[in-house]
Amino acid sequence: MRRGAYTPRSTPFPRDRRSYNAGKGRSFRSYRRRGPVRPLARRNLFGDDHARAFTYKTLSEDQFGPDFTIHNNNYKSSYISMPVKTRALSDNRVGDYIKLVNISFTGTVCIKNSQMESDGSPMLGLHGLFTCVLVRDKTPRIYSATEPLIPFPQLFGSINASYADLSIQDPYKDRFTVIRQVSYPVNTEKGDHMCRFKGTRRFGGRYPIWTSFKDDGGSGDSSGLYSNTYKNAILVYYVWLSDVSSQLEMYCKYVTRYIG
C-alpha cells in the first residue's frame, strides 16, 4: 500500500473553507431581537371587571299564583324575565346585551272541574288540551296599556289554533317566531287532574340570539323587564282548551342560561 501525501478528490464546489464555515461559531446574541419586547395582550392594571364578568351565567324564574289561573277556552300571556344590570357576581349582566344559550322549563298544572251535579256535588270528568308556547319577539314594544303583550288570538289567528302546530299570522312573521311548543292532552273521568310538563330550547349555531336592552340612563331603568328590552324578548303563552267548565292552576320554573 502506498503511503504518501493525501490528494483530495476533485469537486465542482469551491475549496474556500471560509464560505463553508461562514456563520459557524457566531454568537447567538447577534440574532436576538433588539429593543423591548411588548406583551402579547394589553393588560389593564386598574381593574376593569367588564370583560372578566362577561361569562356563562344562569337565571331562574318561577311563574305561579292567582295571575296564572286559567279558565277553560282561555289563555294567559307572560314573558321570561332577563337579568338585571348590576355588579353582583351572579344572575346579572354587566352590559346592555346578553347572548342566550338555552332556556329550559318544568312545571305542573292542576285542573279542576267547575261544574256541579244537581245535588251540589262536583261533576266528574275532564277532557281538554293544555299548551305552553315560547315566542321570540324581535322588536318588543307595548301592545296597549291594558294588555302589554300582543294577544294570542291576534298572533295565531284564534285560540283554537293550539289544537295543532302553531304558526304566526302573516302580518307578524317578520317580528315573531315560535321557538318551542309543548302540548299535553287531558282525558280523565275524575273531577280533577294534575300533570307535569317540560321543555327546552337551545340557541346557537349560525344564528345565535342576542338580547339587548334600552337601559335609559335618565330613568335609571336597567331591569330585565319586557318594557326595557330593545331586541329579542321571549314571550310565553299558556292555553287551556276544554268543553268542560273548568279551572287550571299552574306552576312553572324557567332556567335561562346566557353569556353576559
Swiss-Prot record:
Q: Briefly, what is this protein's role?
A: Binds to the genomic viral ssDNA, shuttles it into and out of the cell nucleus. Begomoviruses use 2 proteins to transport their DNA from cell to cell. The nuclear shuttle protein (NSP) shuttles it between nucleus and cytoplasm and the movement protein (MP) probably transports the DNA-NSP complex to the cell periphery and facilitates movement across the cell wall.
InterPro entries the UniProt entry points to = Gemini_BR1, GV_A/BR1_coat, Viral_coat
Q: Does Chaperone show up as a keyword for this record? A: no
* Disordered as annotated region, ranges: 1-29
| Family to which the UniProt record says this protein belongs | Belongs to the begomovirus nuclear shuttle protein family.
Which species is the source of this protein? Indian cassava mosaic virus
Superkingdom: Viruses
Recorded GO MF terms:
single-stranded DNA binding; structural molecule activity
Entry GO CC: host cell; host cell cytoplasm; host cell nucleus; host cell plasma membrane; membrane; viral capsid
Q: How does it assemble?
A: Binds to single-stranded and double-stranded viral DNA. Interacts with the host nuclear shuttle interacting (NSI) protein. This interaction may allow NSP to recruit NSI monomers to the viral genome and thus regulate nuclear export of viral genome by NSP.
User: Where are the annotated segments for Interaction with Arabidopsis thaliana NSI protein?
Assistant: 154-191
UniProt short sequence motif Bipartite nuclear localization signal, positions renumbered to this chain:
21-42
> Chief subcellular site?
host cell
> Which stretch carries the motif Nuclear localization signal?
84-100
Biological process GO terms, please? Answer: DNA transport; transport of virus in host, cell to cell
Keywords for this protein: DNA-binding, Host cell membrane, Host cytoplasm, Host membrane, Host nucleus, Host-virus interaction, Membrane, Transport, Viral movement protein
Q: Does the keyword DNA-binding apply?
A: yes
* A Pfam cross-reference name: Gemini_coat
| Name under which the protein is recorded | Nuclear shuttle protein
Q: Signal sequence span per UniProt?
A: none
Q: How does it sit in the membrane?
A: Peripheral membrane protein
Q: Which residues cross the membrane?
A: none
Subcellular location per the Swiss-Prot or TrEMBL entry: Host nucleus; Host cytoplasm; Host cell membrane
